[in-house]
Amino acid sequence: MGSCFSFQIAVGDQTMNRIFDCLIGKSYIRTLEKNLRALQREMEDLRATQHEVQNKVAREESRHQQRLEAVQVWLDRVNSIDIECKDLLSVSPVELQKLCLCGLCTKYVCSSYKYGKKVFLLLEEVKILKSEGNFDEVSQPPPRSEVEERPTQPTIGQEEMLEKAWNRLMEDGVGIMGLHGMGGVGKTTLFKKIHNKFAEIGGTFDIVIWIVVSQGAKLSKLQEDIAEKLHLCDDLWKNKNESDKATDIHRVLKGKRFVLMLDDIWEKVDLEAIGIPYPSEVNKCKVAFTTRSREVCGEMGDHKPMQVNCLEPEDAWELFKNKVGDNTLSSDPVIVGLAREVAQKCRGLPLALNVIGETMASKTMVQEWEYAIDVLTRSAAEFSGMENKILPILKYSYDSLGDEHIKSCFLYCALFPEDGQIYTETLIDKLICEGFIGEDQVIKRARNKGYAMLGTLTRANLLTKVGTELANLLTKVSIYHCVMHDVVREMALWIASDFGKQKENFVVQASAGLHEIPEVKDWGAVRRMSLMRNEIEEITCESKCSELTTLFLQSNQLKNLSGEFIRYMQKLVVLDLSDNRDFNELPEQISGLVSLQYLDLSFTRIEQLPVGLKELKKLTFLDLAYTARLCSISGISRLLSLRVLSLLGSKVHGDASVLKELQQLENLQDLAITLSAELISLDQRLAKVISILGIEGFLQKPFDLSFLASMENLSSLWVKNSYFSEIKCRESETDSSYLHINPKIPCFTNLSRLDIVKCHSMKDLTWILFAPNLVVLFIEDSREVGEIINKEKATNLTSITPFLKLERLILCYLPKLESIYWSPLPFPLLLNIDVEECPKLRKLPLNATSAPKVEEFRILMYPPELEWEDEDTKNRFLPEMVSTSTSSKDPLLRNGIPRCLKSESTLLLLILLYLSSCRAFGLYN
């Protein structure tokens, strides 16, 4: 320790007493080493006790308990002591060096004394804290929150949705959450359940504010409702302007962790103008709302809102049973089956299930139930409770549309059958002719506006998008289909008939099993008539429909249409006769339909166009697709207003005179046509308007693709029964083994669908690298195809990543196919890969990161054995594999039925639609 210091002092001197006290009195210096060791040991024990207490607190808080204030004070003191202890121990080596005489003395009396005293006192405090850390209780129930439980009825089928919505709202990164869904679907009930959970968990939030907004609510009313919850609404406050009120609301809420719940909003609520602090991860506040419009969700800042859907069939039946009651259901064995049928009419809509269930609760006679089914089938608006309890509630969604054209578009959709898919492209073309989309003469712009209008209806939950998995294979052009909920459809028909006062305005008996035209009391009152999807064979009656503008007769068994029936239809704008497979002749009285703009004769046996057709000066849309017996369209050049024409799959595609007729149609903007070998040379203007092209019977080797480059609007191409070894663009005639691409040739930017069928000499399709927006690729029965994209031919095109827009890849009966692409591809939008009878294809161009955002990705493959890029890829995609059987040629009729097809009727409908589409595209003979 070094030499000890010496000093001389008289005994009894005051200085000596102080030194003695420093060295011996409290033993701060003499016991310093011992105290330091004890402090380290006791501090370690205290930390262990601290961890035990913290774990107890965490467990209790996970049970929504609140930690005791004494526990928090103790934990804060431990943290403070821990810091102080670390500081003291960090300088202990220096302090120990100051000691001498085996620790009995020190070179620096004052500093060693002070340090020793701090160590001693800290040691005592650590011991005290350690003894105080033995808590019997670390928490207590939280104080009652300012959340008044809202009365709710028991719910059925919403438990999973409630859990998902609650968990999402409680996520740290979620400040704003929207729930959207159609009227009557149960949004408010679900919202109340969420509200009441805040009452269950207690003081996590300082205040939960519930506000019913409703349609047309003003800012001042919202401020007043919120102020009442915050106890601000005195006379002085009421006299302030909106800006000052917002300041007061913001001042109160800024210091609180709040939840604002806005039920039933119809437009964006300006939170800032009201005075609501914007929710963030810092303030941990929440704003939740319900709305019928997905568009409002986006405007409010929730770009991933949660949709509240109708109940599944079994949940709907359970709810309906509860409303009807066991006594009624057990009163007669037959009633249970009838009750199920009534419940099915509600299509899972809780509002309808509740109202109709309550109405039927006292009905114990079988005949009463049979009558209810008849009314709900024939005219649901007449059912008790429908006009005053269901339809007016749904009508709010219609009223909120604002734009009269969009309202008319919505009502027009009611002409289609219940549960029927509405093909968007044909619907929009009809809406254009009806005048609902405006006066734009450019078809593409008008169609885009039509899609925007349907988007508005979809976001308002008045229509539902369907067919994202199968749509591109089931339709000719449509990107998607839409359907209208049955109860919403009844609301539309109710509105269209002036709330039931003029039922003959809209005569809609689609899919009604009719064998003849229904009786109509006043033909002169009929504005629109839909008799599609029935079994009507003849229409021979006379009808004076002088006001009729729309007539749907498609998908019947029509053989004869009397001229007397259409004689007085001078105002008829839309006439759809498609899919009448035995219909072979239009009456000459067609010439009297002077207002006709839309005529669909596709999938009929019509053999020639009537001479009077040329009198239809306003005809804008003419569909003659798949008229296999139509020999001539002579005189069509007289239809000077024609803008859209389809001759796809028609027999006239082999007649060169057709092109001469078409070249005279100066206003033609959209043409679908099938070309045979002798018609490869096209007028430049005509080529530019082709949107759908079928090619059949080409024998060139190789096939020069250059003539297609001028078809700048080509969206769909199918090639059938053609024999060429490759498809190429003209650049060099000397080397036919490579794909020669001329950079000056525009790529096929609009091509979204490609079908290759029975092209037995083709070896690859490398040229599709120049179709960057391809959505569907279908290749079938082409024996020589060995690869989709050839690596050697694409050597100079490595900068192009193929299939970035592809959703559906179907490969069938390709015995030599070994490769799709030589390395993994991202496939950001891919939904399905369907492979059948491609025995040499053992590897798909996938890795673990392919198809990243697709929830319903599916692979149908027979046989299912594959080589994978790596183990991660296998784990990613193997669960999505569906083995297919070899019993069917059709890729949709195999065992790998999509998960979305839950009912036999839906599956049958899709199969029939698909087969129809395959015939339409000429995929099957």
From Swiss-Prot:
LRR repeats lie at residues 525-546, 547-568, 571-594, 595-617, 618-640, 641-663. ATP binds at G181, M182, G183, G184, V185, G186, K187, T188. GO terms for biological process: defense response to other organism. Keywords: ATP-binding, Coiled coil, Leucine-rich repeat, Nucleotide-binding, Plant defense, Repeat. Residues 25-69 form a coiled coil. The keyword Repeat applies. Residues 134-154 are annotated as: Disordered. The keyword Nucleotide-binding applies. InterPro entries: Apaf_helical, LRR_dom_sf, LRR_R13L4/SHOC2-like, NB-ARC, P-loop_NTPase, Plant_NBS-LRR, WH-like_DNA-bd_sf. SUPFAM superfamilies: L domain-like, P-loop containing nucleoside triphosphate hydrolases. Residues 139-442 form the NB-ARC domain. One of its GO terms (molecular function) is ADP binding. Probable disease resistance protein. Belongs to the disease resistance NB-LRR family. The LRR repeats probably act as specificity determinant of pathogen recognition. This is Probable disease resistance protein At1g61310. It comes from Arabidopsis thaliana.
